[in-house]
């Protein structure tokens, strides 16, 4: 099973994917400098690290990124897992956001949100609580699991695909995601994420596929 074709990569050596938009287009909420560091340095470092870790592991070189995440999780190889998962998580995150995004969705995703959270406002409140409440580095996710939407958080490089959960939306709450523009104000960043950044088409596409 492939969880997300936009996040998965088929084989070694892995590459840094291009951003699916112009980094200038998130002004005034985010400066291009944030993307220069977050994408160009942090995400790229995970790619380089994973390629170095796999350079002498021919069997793993034949696996796609999601298979490497599964293998490293089952075999307790933290170094490979952390870098592979962070590549996948970041690739998924870049598609979870878009310029002039956010706000209230429509269609099937709104129907499911209303069913599972009572209202869109209820979803926003719970998502913000989980994202802000993640202690230290990590991620907040909207997933579809056990036939319903759930909001979960993962620490560090944790990813829902390692636990068989279907991710729909990711919010990066590592400090490198927001510190240049928001310093230590994670609640402000999460507010902006919900109101102005979520790519609801991507979320719905993940739900219905």
Curated annotation (Swiss-Prot):
List of residues binding Mn(2+): 38, 90, 172, 176
Signal peptide: none
Claim: Manganese is one of the keywords in the record: yes
Free-text comment on the cofactor: Binds 1 Mn(2+) or Fe(3+) ion per subunit.
GO molecular function: metal ion binding; superoxide dismutase activity
Enzyme Commission code: 1.15.1.1
Superkingdom of origin: Bacteria
Leading EC class: oxidoreductase
InterPro entries hit by this protein: Mn/Fe_SOD, Mn/Fe_SOD_BS, Mn/Fe_SOD_C, Mn/Fe_SOD_N, Mn/Fe_SOD_N_sf, SOD_C_sf
Annotated residues for binding of Fe(3+): 38, 90, 172, 176
Protein name stated in the entry: Superoxide dismutase [Mn/Fe]
Lineage, broadest ranks: Bacteria, Pseudomonadati, Pseudomonadota, Alphaproteobacteria, Rickettsiales
């Amino acid at each position: 099973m492939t969880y997300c074709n936009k996040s998965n990569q088929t084989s070694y050596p892995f590459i840094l994917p291009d951003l699916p938009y112009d980094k200038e287009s998130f002004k005034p909420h985010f400066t291009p400098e944030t993307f220069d560091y977050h994408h160009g340095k942090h995400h790229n470092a995970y790619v380089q690290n994973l390629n170095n870790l796999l350079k002498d592991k021919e069997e793993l070189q034949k696996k796609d990124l999601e298979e490497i995440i599964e293998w490293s999780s089952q075999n307790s190889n933290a170094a490979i897992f952390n870098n592979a998962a962070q590549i996948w998580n970041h690739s998924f995150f870049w598609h979870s956001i878009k310029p002039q995004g956010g706000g209230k969705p429509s269609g099937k995703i709104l129907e499911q949100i209303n069913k599972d959270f009572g209202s869109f406002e209820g979803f926003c409140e719970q998502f913000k609580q989980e994202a802000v409440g993640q202690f230290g580095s990590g991620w907040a996710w909207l997933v579809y699991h056990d036939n319903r939407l759930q909001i979960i958080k993962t620490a560090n490089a944790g990813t829902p695909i390692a636990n068989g959960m279907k991710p729909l939306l990711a919010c990066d709450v590592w400090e490198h995601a927001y510190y240049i523009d928001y310093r230590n104000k994670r609640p402000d960043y999460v507010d902006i994420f919900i109101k102005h950044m979520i790519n609801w088409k991507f979320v719905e596409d993940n739900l219905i596929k």
